[in-house]
Amino acid sequence: MPKRRLDPLPSAAFQILLSLAGEDLHGYGIMRQVVEQTEGRMRLGPGTLYSSIRTLLEAKLIQEVDQLEDVKLGHERRRYYRLTSAGRKLACSEAERLADLLRPARTKKILRGRYV
């Protein structure tokens, strides 16, 4: 995979990694989690979601896992995704990079309230 696709990490890919930091999720679950964790500021459509998932899978930042509970409950097999250790490390690095970018805004008192 060409490095340029993940350097810097696109916002959609970062949000997908964050959504998988707590639990394994299927595509629709990732879409809902991204809306929740961004308080509605970001919504991933199916095209963006699945092209980002494909890129993250190819880079081994996430992996596909089976969820037998869905089958037991009579649901169609869904593709679930899990954050890999490399994905967690990249999410941490990206969060630190973003925090560093915001430091001047905090220092200059541009950010207020909950952002400080």
Q: Residue locations for each model-derived region?
A:
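Amphipathic alpha-helical dimerization/coiled-coil segments
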Residues: M1, A86-V116
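Basic, short loop/linker segments at the boundary and entry of helix-turn-helix/winged-helix-like folds
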Residues: M1-L9, Y81
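N-terminal helix-turn-helix DNA-binding core of bacterial DNA-binding proteins
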Residues: L6-T48
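Basic amphipathic alpha-helical segments that dock to polyanions
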Residues: L49-L56
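Beta-hairpin "wing" of winged helix-turn-helix
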Residues: L57-G74, R82
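Exposed loop/turn and edge beta-strand positions of beta-sandwich/beta-sheet ligand-binding modules
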Residues: R77
